[in-house]
């Protein structure tokens, strides 16, 4: 049994078929092993948030669209954590990225939602949310 409460931990399986999990804003972690319990690690934080990462395929598609829209070299490192601004995107580039995402995924991103997208992961999470909403 493991208990995790309120800064940030990332867990990933050794099996490639399983998607990584992320938990943000942890306060403590306790991992008892074979009947032995270790003192919990305590960290400063006021709240607990669980982030559900988008499917890796969605993140990969978003990375490809971002690379294309920003005319980045194929060997550019674009990941879920990549910020559009850090990649050199200005506001017009961001609008074009959102338009490319809408076309690729068959979704409509509202202006308020588009303004909240800062990273590739933000975009991928929003896309999956909109696809789920559209099909449900």
Swiss-Prot record:
Carrier of the growing fatty acid chain in fatty acid biosynthesis. It comes from Casuarina glauca (Swamp oak). Pathway: Lipid metabolism; fatty acid biosynthesis. The keyword Phosphoprotein applies. Belongs to the acyl carrier protein (ACP) family. SMART domains: PKS_PP. Its main location: plastid. It comes from the Eukaryota. One of its GO terms (cellular component) is chloroplast. The lineage of its organism: Eukaryota, Viridiplantae, Streptophyta, Embryophyta, Tracheophyta. GO terms for molecular function: acyl carrier activity; phosphopantetheine binding. Residues 1-52 form a transit peptide. Transmembrane segments: none annotated. This is Acyl carrier protein 1, chloroplastic. Disulfide bonds: none annotated. 4'-phosphopantetheine is transferred from CoA to a specific serine of apo-ACP by acpS. This modification is essential for activity because fatty acids are bound in thioester linkage to the sulfhydryl of the prosthetic group. InterPro entries: ACP, ACP-like_sf, ACP_chloroplastic, PKS_PP-bd, PP-bd_ACP, Ppantetheine_attach_site. It is found in: Plastid, Chloroplast. The modification O-(pantetheine 4'-phosphoryl)serine is found at residue 91.
